[in-house]
């Protein structure tokens, strides 16, 4: 039975980058790892309504730099920057380290797989039909320039006694092509019948390697000489 590997993890070091960037010796590694997990969990729970897609963490000496990618940065920053300042103080109290927070706005949230998955999950919690929620999200993504999108919902859909998986796709999703820029998101919907898992894959096109300028110049010169 074939299993789907996380498309982001498969492409790390090829066309995707790490979400955590730091080096540590054996003594500090586990401490930093647990601290990263706690930071991500705290920010996600506190600012879930801001549409947070990704949290990047960098470390240097006693400083922690956090880059938050959000669809609604205004909810995080708050009036006059009060919200982000309060968040920084809470994180400093939790980690006992100097915290620097940077907010990056997601320009097109309809093309961000994590945000799309969370939107579908929130609609399922409001008892909206899973087919309607999935198809609307797919139509919006395709209209805004996605090359392909696939959505899957698993669990006791519509309160059914036997759990099942329903999935729809539109366009192409080349999961085996490593140069394909595929975004992946996962969210859970808490319903009265239990949890439903929501997965979203969005294909945005191929990431082609940059052509070296010197090679292009040599070709131009050879054409002129000919």
Swiss-Prot record:
InterPro entries of this UniProt entry?
A: KH_dom, KH_dom-like_a/b, KH_dom_type_2, KH_sf_prok-type, Ribosomal_S3_C_sf, Ribosomal_uS3_bac-typ, Ribosomal_uS3_C, Ribosomal_uS3_CS
- In terms of superkingdom, the source organism counts as Bacteria
Its BP terms in the Gene Ontology are: translation
All copies of domain KH type-2, residue ranges: 39-107
Q: Which GO molecular function annotation, any one, does this entry have?
A: structural constituent of ribosome
Q: Which Pfam families match?
A: KH_2 (PF07650), Ribosomal_S3_C (PF00189)
Write the record's keywords in alphabetical order, separated by commas: Ribonucleoprotein, Ribosomal protein, RNA-binding, rRNA-binding
Regions annotated as coiled coil: none
Note the PROSITE patterns from the entry: KH_TYPE_2, RIBOSOMAL_S3
Q: Name one GO cellular component term.
A: cytosolic small ribosomal subunit
**Which family would the database say this protein is a member of?**
Belongs to the universal ribosomal protein uS3 family.
Complex formation: Part of the 30S ribosomal subunit. Forms a tight complex with proteins S10 and S14.
Q: Which NCBIfam families match?
A: rpsC_bact
What is this protein's function per UniProt?
A: Binds the lower part of the 30S subunit head. Binds mRNA in the 70S ribosome, positioning it for translation.
What name goes with this protein?
Small ribosomal subunit protein uS3
Q: What is the species listed in this Swiss-Prot or TrEMBL entry?
A: Acetivibrio thermocellus (strain ATCC 27405 / DSM 1237 / JCM 9322 / NBRC 103400 / NCIMB 10682 / NRRL B-4536 / VPI 7372)
Lineage of the native species?
Bacteria, Bacillati, Bacillota, Clostridia, Eubacteriales
Q: Which gene encodes it?
A: rpsC
């Amino acid at each position: 039975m074939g299993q789907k590997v996380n498309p982001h993890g498969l492409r790390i070091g090829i066309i995707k980058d790490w979400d955590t960037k730091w080096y540590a010796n054996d003594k500090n590694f586990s401490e930093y790892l647990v601290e990263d997990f706690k930071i991500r969990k705290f920010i996600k729970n506190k600012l879930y309504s801001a549409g947070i897609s990704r949290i990047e963490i960098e470390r240097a000496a006693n400083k922690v730099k956090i880059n938050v990618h959000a669809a609604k940065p205004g909810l995080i920053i708050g009036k006059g920057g009060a919200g982000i300042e309060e968040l920084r103080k809470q994180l400093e109290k939790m980690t006992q380290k100097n915290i620097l927070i940077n907010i990056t706005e997601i320009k097109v949230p309809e093309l961000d797989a994590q945000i799309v998955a969370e939107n579908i999950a929130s609609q399922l919690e409001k008892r909206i039909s899973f087919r309607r929620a999935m198809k609307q999200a797919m139509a919006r993504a395709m209209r805004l320039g996605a090359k392909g999108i696939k959505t899957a919902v698993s669990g006791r859909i519509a309160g059914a006694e036997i759990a099942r998986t329903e999935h729809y796709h539109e366009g192409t999703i080349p999961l085996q092509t490593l140069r394909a820029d595929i975004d992946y998101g996962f969210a859970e919907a808490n319903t009265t019948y239990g949890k439903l898992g929501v997965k979203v894959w969005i294909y945005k096109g191929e990431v082609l390697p940059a052509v070296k300028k010197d090679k292009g110049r040599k070709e131009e010169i050879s054409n002129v000489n000919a």
